[in-house]
C-alpha cells in the first residue's frame, strides 16, 4: 500500500498540474531508490493506514521545492514528518509560495519563509558539490515530536551534513510566519524587478532549471553596523530574481540596474561581467568562476566568505578572486606589515571577525544572509545579533577595499614581500565576558546571541576603530 502511494506521487504533477510543476521529473523511480521499497524504510513513521493518508494529505497535490531538493521518497517523507512534528506545517501550505518555495525557482526569497526554502535548496546544492548524495537506505535524521527537536548524530560526514540541512530548514520554517497572500504567487511578480536584462537558460540535473540573467553595471555603498538591523526589510522589499540551481552547483547571478538580490556561495557558468579598475570608463569583459571570497586560514583551513565576495563584485564589478592574492592579508591570515591601504582593509576585516568571534559567535555555523543592493546601497539581512555583526564586518570591509587604490604590482600569490610576524589587531573589545557558544550543552544555548552589552561594544568597535578608509590603528607584535 505504502509503496503504491509513494510511486503514485511521481504521477501527481503530470495530472492536471500547474505548468511549473516538475516538467523535468523522471518517469521512473529516482536513482538509488530500491525497487523493493518496504515498510522498513519508514519504521516508526507510519503507524497505520490512517497515518499514511495523513502524510500524503500533508504533501498536497504537488509539494513545491521539496520535489526539487529530494531525489528519493524515504528522505522526503522523513522531512515531511519532521516538518509536521516540529514546525506544525505541511508542504501543501507552500503551494507555489513566494519565489523559491515552489518546484521551479522563479526568483529570490520575498519573505522569511521563502528564505527558508532558498537556504534549504542552497544547502543541498553545496552538499552535492561535496559529492554528498542522498541514500534512501540511510535515514540519519532523528525527529522527536514530543520535544519538537531534530537530532543529527550520524558519524558519517555526508549524512550529518544532509541532516543538518534538513534540521536548519525545518527550524527556520518553525520560526517563520506564513503570508497567505504569497500562495499561488504569479511568477511575473518575481521577475518584475529585473529590467534591462538578457535571459539565458542553463540545463540542470537534480535541481530545477533556472533562468540566469546577465549582470548590468552596478555600484554599492557600504552599510554601517547600526544599519544592519534594518537589512531584513530590504530583503522583503527588493524582490528581484536570481535563481540558482542544480545539484551540480550550476548557478547564476543577477545584478539588476536598480535592485539587486544576490545569492552567495555558488559557482557561475562564466557570465560576462564588467571589470572596473579605478577608472569606471575603462572596462573589460571577463567571466567570474565564482562570487565568493576565499580566505586561507590557519592550518590551511579554507574559509568561504560569500557575503564579502558578493559585495565586492556588486561594488567594483571585479571578480572576488582578484582580491584574494593581494598584498599580505587579502585572502589569507598573512604576516608582516600591510603593503598599502587595501591590504590594511583586509587585515581590518580579519580583526573585525576576530572581535565578533570573541563575543561567542561561531561565524562558520551562521546561516547565510542574502545580499541586497537597493539603489546601489548594499544590505544583508540577519536574524540574530551574530548575523548582523557579520554583515557589518563584511559591508565595512567591502567599502574600505573599494575606496582604496588597487595596485596590480601587489597582486601575487607568492607573498614573498611579507616577512615577519602577523600584525596584531587593536584590542578594542577587551575584556569581553564569555558568551554562550554553539558548542554549549543544550540546543537552546546554540541559539543564543551575545549579551546586549557585548553587542554594544562590538558596534562601537565597528564605528570607532575604522579610520577614513575603514582601517583602525594596527601595530606589530
From Swiss-Prot:
Taxonomic lineage from the root: Eukaryota, Metazoa, Chordata, Craniata, Vertebrata
Stretches for region Phospholipase A2-like 3: 373-425
Record's function text: Major protein of the otoconia, a calcium carbonate structure in the saccule and utricle of the ear. Together with OTOL1, acts as a scaffold for otoconia biomineralization: sequesters calcium and forms interconnecting fibrils between otoconia that are incorporated into the calcium crystal structure. Together with OTOL1, modulates calcite crystal morphology and growth kinetics. It is unlikely that this protein has phospholipase A2 activity.
Note on domains (UniProt): Consists of 3 PA2-type domains.
Region (Disordered): 428-477
Organism: Homo sapiens
Gene Ontology biological process terms, A to Z: arachidonate secretion; lipid catabolic process; otolith mineralization; phosphatidylcholine metabolic process; phosphatidylglycerol metabolic process
Region (Phospholipase A2-like 2) residue spans: 305-361
Assembly mode: Interacts with OTOL1.
Positions of the UniProt region annotated as Phospholipase A2-like 1: 76-190
Skewed-composition ranges (Acidic residues): 442-452
Primary gene name: OC90
Disulfide bond listed as a keyword: yes
Keyword Ribosomal protein: no
This protein's name: Otoconin-90
Sorted UniProt keywords: Calcium, Disulfide bond, Glycoprotein, Metal-binding, Repeat, Secreted, Signal
Listed GO CC annotations: extracellular matrix; extracellular region
Amino acid at each position: 500500500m505504502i509503496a503504491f502511494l509513494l510511486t503514485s506521487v511521481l504521477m501527481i504533477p503530470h495530472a492536471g498540474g500547474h505548468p511549473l510543476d516538475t516538467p523535468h521529473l523522471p518517469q521512473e523511480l529516482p536513482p538509488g531508490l530500491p525497487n523493493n521499497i518496504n515498510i522498513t524504510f519508514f519504521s516508526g513513521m507510519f503507524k497505520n493506514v490512517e497515518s499514511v493518508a495523513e502524510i500524503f494529505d500533508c504533501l498536497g497535490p504537488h509539494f513545491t521545492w521539496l520535489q526539487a531538493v529530494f531525489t528519493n521518497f524515504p528522505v522526503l517523507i522523513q522531512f515531511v514528518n519532521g516538518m509536521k512534528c516540529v514546525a506544525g506545517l505541511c508542504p501543501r501550505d507552500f503551494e507555489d509560495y513566494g519565489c523559491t518555495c515552489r518546484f521551479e525557482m522563479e526568483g529570490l526569497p520575498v519573505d522569511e519563509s521563502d528564505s527558508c526554502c532558498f537556504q534549504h535548496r542552497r544547502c543541498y546544492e553545496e552538499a552535492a558539490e561535496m559529492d554528498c548524495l542522498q541514500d534512501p537506505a540511510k535515514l540519519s535524521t532523528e525527529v522527536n515530536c514530543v520535544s519538537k527537536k531534530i537530532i543529527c548524530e550520524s558519524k558519517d560526514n555526508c549524512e550529518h551534513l544532509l541532516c543538518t540541512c534538513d534540521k536548519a530548514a525545518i527550524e527556520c520554517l518553525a520560526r517563520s510566519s506564513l503570508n497567505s497572500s504569497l500562495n499561488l504567487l504569479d511568477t511575473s511578480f518575481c521577475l518584475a524587478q529585473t529590467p534591462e536584462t538578457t535571459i539565458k537558460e542553463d540545463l540542470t540535473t537534480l535541481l530545477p532549471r533556472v533562468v540566469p540573467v546577465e549582470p548590468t553595471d552596478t555600484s554599492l555603498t557600504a552599510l554601517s553596523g547600526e544599519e544592519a538591523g534594518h537589512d531584513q526589510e530590504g530583503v522583503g522589499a527588493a524582490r528581484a530574481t536570481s535563481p540558482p540551481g542544480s545539484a551540480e552547483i550550476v548557478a547564476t547571478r543577477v545584478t539588476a540596474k536598480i535592485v539587486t538580490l544576490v545569492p552567495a556561495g555558488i559557482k557561475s557558468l562564466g557570465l560576462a561581467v564588467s571589470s572596473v579598475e579605478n577608472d569606471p570608463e575603462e572596462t573589460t569583459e571577463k567571466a567570474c568562476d565564482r562570487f565568493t571570497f576565499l580566505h586561507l586560514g590557519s592550518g590551511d583551513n579554507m574559509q568561504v566568505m560569500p557575503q564579502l565576495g558578493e559585495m565586492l563584485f556588486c561594488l567594483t564589478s571585479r571578480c572576488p578572486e582578484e582580491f584574494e592574492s593581494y598584498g599580505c592579508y587579502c585572502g589569507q591570515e598573512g604576516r608582516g606589515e600591510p603593503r598599502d591601504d587595501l591590504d590594511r582593509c583586509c587585515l581590518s576585516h580579519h580583526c573585525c571577525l576576530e572581535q565578533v568571534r570573541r563575543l561567542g559567535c561561531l561565524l562558520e555555523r551562521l546561516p547565510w544572509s542574502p545580499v541586497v543592493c537597493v539603489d546601489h546601497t548594499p544590505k544583508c539581512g540577519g536574524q540574530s545579533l551574530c548575523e548582523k555583526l557579520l554583515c557589518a564586518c563584511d559591508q565595512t570591509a567591502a567599502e574600505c577595499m573599494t575606496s582604496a587604490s588597487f595596485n596590480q604590482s601587489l597582486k601575487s600569490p607568492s607573498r614573498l614581500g611579507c616577512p615577519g610576524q602577523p600584525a596584531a589587531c587593536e584590542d578594542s573589545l577587551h575584556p569581553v565576558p564569555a558568551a554562550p557558544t554553539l558548542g554549549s550543552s543544550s540546543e537552546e544555548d546554540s541559539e543564543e546571541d551575545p549579551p546586549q552589552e557585548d553587542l554594544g561594544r562590538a558596534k562601537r568597535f565597528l564605528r570607532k576603530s575604522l579610520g577614513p578608509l575603514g582601517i583602525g590603528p594596527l601595530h606589530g607584535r
